Regions:
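Alpha-helical transmembrane segments in multi-pass integral membrane proteins
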Residues: 2-20, 30, 34-59, 78-90, ...
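Alpha-helical transmembrane segments and their helix-entry boundary regions
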Residues: 21, 91-92, 100, 169, ...
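Active-site His/Glu-centered metal-binding helix of metallohydrolases
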Residues: 27, 38, 68, 171-175, ...
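Helical transmembrane-bundle signal
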Residues: 32, 69, 75, 108, ...
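Membrane-interface helix-loop-helix regions
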Residues: 53-60, 100-174, 202-225, 289-303
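Loop-to-transmembrane-helix entry motif
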Residues: 96, 100-104, 321-328
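Hydrophobic, aromatic-rich transmembrane alpha-helices
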Residues: 176-198, 241
Length: 390
């Protein structure tokens, strides 16, 4: 890819990047979209007391977030490690804010509009006061999380960002970026290796030991004590692995990687829920193996791969859509979930057309946000606030 080509993966940077990793990020974002469709059936079951709430299709789709964290560590380390003699910490923060925050704001606005479309009705049937919804909107725009049970946690489900739930991962992504700029980038490869191993041990203890009680690596979405520390470890371990991979990476040209890795992600996310009989969470153990061993392998393969022609164009489109799709699809899911609950629908067979509409609408909305808002706004912010660097 040419150095002056616009890319959603690394906006305003002049260093070439890995197109296949962009594409895999897009594949993972689409799988998150499908995962949340099936999560809706589980949520409706639990809300209506009609089932056990286990997600039975794409059961492990939530660990796409952990795949994103590895990609983030890899891309940031690759893009910035050798630039600190030309760039200071504030310039780095500006770059990352320009990259991430415009769509975060748009996601909050869309989330507010989606909530308004159902009359600000909470999951328990009560109505959230308009003033507190506006407070939640403002706080989300400034990335200030809601603590469970405070008035501006307006949906009553304990989410950090009740207008747009996936904002929790951006909260930890920001922490990862700040950690990188302040101290992680200064670590030697040996120290980073030790740091990553220690984080891996903490990660295994927390999740395989089922400290959260979730029997899965699904923490971080709320700000209670278990979820905050669990979410922090959940982000830092794969993020540091991504950094370590970028520093030690030795490329080899491998053909067909995009399709191999895409199929692998589908298969890994589709493994059925693994029930546990003792104190060890076998479900979390499987997800830990994915995060600690299999995802880094996929990132390495993606960085080794080459794409041209139709596959290359597909990777560019997927990469550009990945972040907008991730950050704007969930407000539509809230409406979908409310519809499932009210109509007692718990399987895809009973709502195939509506589910297809949700998927198409989410992708279309992401594309419109990308082209009409995200790209123009980031270009303007870059011209306004970033000095051209060599």
């Amino acid at each position: 890819m040419q150095k002056n080509t616009f890319s959603s993966a690394n906006f305003a940077d002049t260093k070439p990047h890995y197109e296949l990793l962009d594409g895999l990020r897009g594949v993972a974002a689409i799988l998150v979209l499908f995962y949340h469709i099936f999560e809706g059936f589980s949520f409706a079951e639990v809300t209506n007391g009609a089932g056990d709430g286990i997600i039975r299709t794409l059961n492990h789709g939530h660990i796409a977030v952990d795949f994103f964290f590895i990609l983030s560590g890899f891309v940031i380390s690759y893009a910035y490690d050798d630039r600190w003699n030309k760039m200071n910490t504030w310039q780095f923060f500006k770059r990352r804010l320009i990259r991430l925050h415009p769509m975060l704001i748009m996601g909050a606005i869309i989330g507010c509009l989606a909530f308004a479309s159902v009359g600000f009705e909470r999951w328990d049937g009560t109505t959230a006061p308009t003033g507190w919804v506006m407070t939640a909107l403002l706080l989300t725009m400034f990335m200030i999380p809601a603590v469970p049970s405070v008035p501006y946690e307006v949906r009553g489900n304990g989410e950090m960002f009740p207008l747009n739930g996936p904002g929790w991962s951006l909260f930890f992504e920001y922490i990862g970026n700040i950690s990188y700029a302040l101290f992680m980038r200064r670590m030697s490869t040996r120290i980073l290796t030790t740091f990553t191993i220690l984080l891996g041990i903490a990660h295994a203890w927390f999740f395989i030991g089922n400290v959260s009680g979730y029997d899965m690596i699904g923490v971080g979405w709320t700000i209670d004590e278990v979820n905050f520390w669990g979410g922090l470890v959940r982000m830092l371990f794969p993020f540091s692995m991504g950094m370590l991979l970028a520093r030690t990476f030795k490329p080899r040209k491998i053909k067909g990687v995009f399709w191999i890795c895409s199929i692998a992600l589908v298969v890994l996310f589709s493994i059925p829920y693994i029930a546990s009989s003792g104190s060890i969470s076998l479900n979390s153990l499987y997800e830990f193996v994915c995060i600690a061993f299999l995802f880094p392998m996929l990132v390495w393969l993606g960085a080794c791969g080459t794409a041209s022609g139709t596959t290359g164009k597909m990777n560019r489109v997927l990469g550009e859509l990945s972040y907008p799709l991730y950050i704007v699809h969930y407000p539509i899911m809230y409406i979908f979930y409310a519809w499932l609950i009210k109509n007692n629908i718990y399987t895809l067979d009973n709502c195939l057309g509506v589910a297809a509409l949700v998927i198409v609408s989410s992708i279309a909305l992401a594309f419109l946000c990308l082209k009409l808002y995200d790209e123009p706004v980031r270009r303007w912010l870059t011209r306004k606030f970033m000095k051209k660097q060599q």
